[in-house]
Design a protein with these regions (language model features):
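A cross-family kinase active-site recognition segment
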Residues: 109-171, 194
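Active-site activation/catalytic loop segments of kinase-like enzymes and analogous catalytic loops
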Residues: 228-260, 274-290
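ATP-binding pocket architecture of kinase catalytic cores
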Residues: 32-137
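Active-site acidic catalytic loop and adjacent metal/ATP-binding pocket
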Residues: 23-30, 38, 72, 184-230
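All-alpha amphipathic helical-bundle segments outside canonical DNA-binding/catalytic cores
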Residues: 117, 262-272
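Protein kinase glycine-rich loop
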Residues: 17-20
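ATP/Mg2+ or Mg2+-diphosphate-binding catalytic cores
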Residues: 280-309
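Juxta-kinase regulatory segment immediately upstream of eukaryotic protein kinase catalytic domains
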Residues: 1-13
Length: 309
């Protein structure tokens, strides 16, 4: 908390509470004018200053275009990024009102009809995100990590070598290797013709806020350059066990297709890429005895069965 208080001082802010602790530690702070803001202490060495500044530029440009996303807030010195140590940075974003549409690992709220409406709205929001992004002209310094074939299934994937997870059984490891081979072929061929550009890359329930009838999108800290369909696949990844999953998938695709085309089969492949990447993500971030390991491996196995048969 002391580190957060020191960082908050760059905005003359007062720390109220810890909100989340994943790639970033996120705190709610109060600003001198009475507004709330989200203070992010970025995970050291996960993203360098140039990447974080690019993410902040993108969010600011999207907000200016009318997208419901957080607005980066300058420090009292006028900078959007504040250094709190070697390779360790802080940033602050405008407060987004509302609540998450759900939480991973729990049943999605609402009846099937309400869930379908929600996913159609998420599809429309993601299409708008991609459409508005394509109208922007990034500065020469704009740089984001690549969510491409190498980023998912290369020798050093962005989130780790999922196929080397120490808790995989021999049968699971074999299926993971099959899935990796499938993705290598599918994504490598798709890279030359797929819709590729800046993506949010973490469209989980926790990152989609609802306030009344409106949706907002938060937490761009995994954003990168990649397959646009990955945003759709990620939005589906927490819902594979939902009874209405086929209808949710179709509603998401239909909502997106109202203003932007997609490739449903590629979306399914990218859904698989996300489920596998999440297994790799846990290897270095969770304790070996954390039950989430088995849950995420089981989910990846379910997704492999759905996509590969």
């Amino acid at each position: 908390m002391i580190q957060a208080e020191t960082a908050a001082a760059a905005w003359d802010g007062r720390v109220l509470r810890l909100l989340a602790e994943r790639e970033n530690r996120v705190f709610q702070i109060a600003l001198p004018d009475g507004r709330f803001a989200a203070l992010r202490l970025h995970r050291p060495s996960y993203r360098d200053a140039g990447v974080i500044r690019s993410e902040l530029w993108w969010c600011a440009a999207l907000a200016e275009a009318g997208l419901p996303v957080p607005v980066p807030l300058p420090t009292k010195n006028g900078d959007l990024l504040h250094s709190i140590g070697p390779d360790h940075h802080a940033s602050a974003l405008s407060w987004i009102e509302g609540i998450p549409v759900g939480k991973g690992g729990t049943a999605l709220a609402g009846d099937a009809e309400a869930q379908v409406r929600l996913f159609a709205a998420i599809g429309r929001l993601l299409a708008r995100l991609h459409n508005e992004t394509d109208r922007l002209t990034p500065p020469p310094t704009f740089t984001l990590p690549r969510w491409d074939a190498a980023g998912f299934i290369g020798r050093a994937p962005r989130w780790g070598r999922f196929w080397d997870h120490p808790q995989l059984s021999p049968a699971e490891a074999a299926r993971f290797h099959d899935a990796r081979a499938f993705l290598r072929d599918r994504l490598s061929h798709a890279e030359s013709q797929a819709d590729i550009g800046p993506i949010h890359a973490d469209v989980l329930r926790e990152n989609v806020f609802v306030n009344g009838g409106s949706l907002s999108l938060i937490d761009f800290d995994d954003s990168g350059i990649g397959f646009r369909g990955y945003d759709l696949g990620t939005a589906l990844s927490q819902n594979l066990y939902e009874p209405a999953y086929p209808a949710l998938r179709q509603a998401l695709l239909d909502g997106y297709a109202e203003t932007r085309p997609s490739d449903p089969e590629l979306v399914d492949a990218l859904l698989l890429a996300r489920c596998l990447a999440s297994v790799g993500w846990m290897i270095t971030r969770l304790a070996p005895d954390d039950p989430a390991h088995s849950r995420f491996i089981d989910r990846a196995m379910l997704c492999i069965a759905q996509v590969l048969g």
